[in-house]
Regions:
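C-terminal segments that line or cap access tunnels to active or ligand-binding sites in enzymes
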Residues: 102-219
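A conserved FAD-binding loop/helix module that cradles the flavin
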Residues: 264-286
């Protein structure tokens, strides 16, 4: 995007954590939620996969619409929602590239690159989904370390890049019953093939990094599924199409009392959309226009 947090994306969480602690909150990690506990159509807490129950007066889900109502809400009569009106967003591959040498030594700039085979972007996507052996529909190349003014102080003589492209979930569906790092040789061979295809675009547009690669790691839609809980490995939750924005039920309030929604499915996709959804959900809970307060404090 147009802004980059000093210290990288982790700085966002690290800046929020003290506020949560100071107001009496608690952050729990490595605690996977199995179920939102519903009693008489009222959310009263969550149940973890280890069986532990955490009771609360409110439950706010940022797990996404699909995950929330297809996996976490397990009551016999789930809310009547027009789920057929929303679709998952596209799945993706992300190649994480570690480099020997600083951005300055390698001549890297912070400008993002968007690489397309031609100007008909819709046709590019349709062609690739129909035949994944054709040209990649798009390759987006980003330079996180170049954008971070604290990078060299914290990480020395290194630099990073990311290269992202679309990838239909069906490419990997044969391995959906497997676990991370235990998917087998065929899966690893496919990852290597895709890594090489992406790197051809990288070398074509950032040729000076050739010979300076220290690490390559490719995430697939299955990686996204396993770490973020999106069943189709979608990159941005639900598809943010015109039809999605016609759905009036996509809002913080739900038909289950004390169960609220937040995250990019409620506002729009990306980091900024997810952050603003927190403000919108807070406004709904407090019944107060918190957005005005935020704008007043930042103006």
């Amino acid at each position: 995007g147009g802004n980059y947090p000093v210290g990288g994306s982790r700085s966002i969480a690290e800046s929020i954590a003290p506020v949560i602690h100071e107001t009496g909150g608690k952050i729990i990690v490595n605690a996977q939620v199995d179920e939102i506990i519903i009693h008489r159509n009222r959310a009263v807490g969550v149940k973890l996969t280890n069986g532990e129950e955490l009771r609360s007066s409110l439950v706010i889900s940022s797990a996404g619409i699909t995950t929330t109502f297809s996996k976490l809400v397990k009551q016999s009569s789930p809310p009547a929602l027009n789920m057929d009106k929303v679709n998952p967003s596209c799945a993706h591959l992300c190649l994480y590239i570690g480099l020997k040498g600083t951005a300055e030594k390698l001549g890297l700039e912070g400008t993002n690159l968007w690489i397309y085979p031609d100007y008909d972007h819709d046709a590019n996507v349709e062609r690739f989904i129909a035949d994944t052996s054709t040209n990649l529909a798009v390759v987006y190349i980003s330079f996180p370390s170049t954008k971070d003014p604290d990078w060299e102080e914290n990480h020395g003589d290194t630099a990073t890049m990311e290269a992202i492209t679309l990838a239909p979930y069906d490419m990997f569906s044969k391995w959906e019953g497997t676990d991370w790092k235990k998917r087998g040789e065929d899966y690893e061979n496919l990852k290597n093939e895709l890594t090489n295809r992406i790197m051809r675009s990288v070398y074509a547009h950032v040729p000076q990094v050739e010979g300076h690669i220290d690490h390559l790691e490719l995430s697939t839609p299955l990686t996204t599924r396993d770490f973020l809980g999106y069943s189709q490995g979608e990159i941005y939750g639900i598809e943010h199409s015109p039809e999605r924005f016609r759905q009036k039920w996509l809002r913080p309030q739900t038909s289950i009392k004390n169960l609220y929604l937040t995250g990019q499915d409620i506002v729009t996709d990306g980091v900024a959309g997810a952050l603003m959804s927190g403000v919108v959900t807070t406004s709904a809970i407090l019944r107060k226009n918190v957005i005005k307060d935020v704008l007043r404090r930042t103006s």
